[in-house]
Amino acid sequence: MQKDKKVSKKSLELLFGKETNQIKMKIITPILLTIFAHTTIFGQEGSLKAELPVIKTSKAFKQLQQIVGKWKGKMKQSDGKIIDVETEYKVIANGSAISQILIEDGLEMITIFNDRNGTLGAIHYCVLGNQPTLVLSNRTKTSLSFDFDPICGLKAGKDKFFNKHEISYNPKKPNEMIQTGTVINEDRTVNASRTELKRVK
């Protein structure tokens, strides 16, 4: 009986020893995997940043960068209706594009500005359900004007779409901006708008 007790004690020690090792491994393994995953991710990010090209942008693009930030204001339409507007501009895609999130009367849209063959252009993802493209038509020290670019396939006299846009911004008054735009209807009549915005600090 004494011998059996000793054997049983050894067996228990061996058993619990194994269980303890298993518990330790269960705790250590996830930690090691987490460390490995983080090391891999950071390594990839580091190498990715090292491989990214230096983006060259147009003068118009650099001018547009001046309005990066959040803005709020009112839009007055040609029919007299006044709408609340919020918008935010961000530099994205390694400095190669500028996104604009626009909320008009609670409806959200997005416009992406970027250089195409050295000329600033834009794609406007509209609540009308289409995506008109615009291209820079004129630039001054305080304004950028865009006209419709038919490359998107929309056609005047057939479709209703946003077809003109102007951003007026004077760096000497960095917290004020005026934007105008037009939407052309299927019958070629035009709805115009003027938006006065203040920078949100």
Stretch-by-stretch model annotation:
Residues 45, 176-201:
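Edge beta-strand at a domain terminus
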Residues 67-72, 93-100, 118-123, 141-147, ...:
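Short, hydrophobic/aromatic-rich segments at coil-to-beta transitions
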Residues 82-109:
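N-terminal mature ectodomain segment of secretory-pathway/periplasmic proteins
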Residues 1-4, 11-46:
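Bacterial Sec-dependent N-terminal signal peptides
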Residues 75-78, 101-104, 124-127, 148-152, ...:
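Beta-turn initiation residues at beta-strand->coil junctions
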Residues 106-137:
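Helix-adjacent hinge/juxtasegments
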Residues 136-173, 180-185:
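Short aromatic loop motif centered on NTY/YTY
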